Amino acid sequence: MLTLDKFEEASKIVSEVTLETKLIYSDFLSEKCGNSIYLKPENMQLTGAYKVRGAYYKISTLTAEERKKGLITASAGNHAQGVAYAAKKFGAKATIVMPTTTPLIKVNRTKNLGAEVVLYGDVYDEACAKAYELADAHGYTFIHPFDDLAVATGQGTIAMEIFKELPLVEYILVPIGGGGLATGVSTLAKLLNPKIKVIGVEPAGANCMQASIKNGKVTTLPTVNTIADGTAVKTPGSNIFPYIQKNLDDIITVEDDELIAAFLDMVENHKMVVENSGLLTVAALNKLNVKGKRVVSILSGGNMDVITMSSVVQQGLIFRDRIFTVSVLLPDKPGELARVAETIAGVQGNVIKLEHNQFVTTNRNAAVELRITLEAFGTDHKNQILDALEKGDYQPKIVRTSL
């Protein structure tokens, strides 16, 4: 059972290995959303995510014999690092089963913390089944990433820190994958202030908790599809589900393109890298149907590999019309490339890539295709560039951008 005494005990124990991440007031998000928005930056933890809280507290409750057997868990990344780090602190051996789709940065960091990594399955649920199989075969002690009350208690210490710093908080937004963080935060928040609203946020393509609440029982999704790999869970925790039903006020879902926009917002306005799962609560702020409230958005982690980061930035710029590609037809004769460049420069467009195709038509005397990838200030500027090209008789057509 989750009790205030246990949360207070966990806070003391967890403080041995975690940072008390201070709330960051966001002028940008507050103005954008019409509420007073505070960010709880768990991406600044030593392991890059909040997961170390639950892992360390859970391992602290084990007997010396259980720790000596060796520990095992399954994780999409952040819980893996939490368990690896906590196990190292307790001098225990850790084996981590991770989906084959786990970003390389999370795999390498887990190995660097001394854990043995086994890559198996496409999603968390498949990795978890493998971890249970290995636990039975070798006698390891299993540390569940979310469906464990001790783990949820450790995660809930975030709420203790939020209330300590912002006693009059009115709303807390918390990401949901399997539900451990949401269980701990919502339960402790309601114990400290029964009137507070705690809103869970899930990816639209992995909304297992929303489906479970709607059905009144733990529900398994047939598939999950989201860029938020850390919350790509098919089945939420059954042990913690009653706490979610009791203490969570609502669930908001967000699309992948909303996460991409949130990533750009955080990088450009807060100079902060937050992974896609950690951005769920930022993306959901626009869907919160209240104004003038004190809202805390929990940023659950920041472990993102550079390749994924690059892809998200590129897609974000394309979504916001700050990068686009246009196809124009030019007479195949000297000077035409310079002329189209002058047209673009005349409206402050910035060319970042050119592709010249002489074989777009069988009549080379008629025209050649030029694909121009441009940088713009946004939609209005993009339209201004297109208008200039139209007036220059270039017959511009928007085509797919490929950088």
Would you name each region that the model predicts?
Residues 1-403:
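PLP-dependent amino-acid enzyme catalytic core
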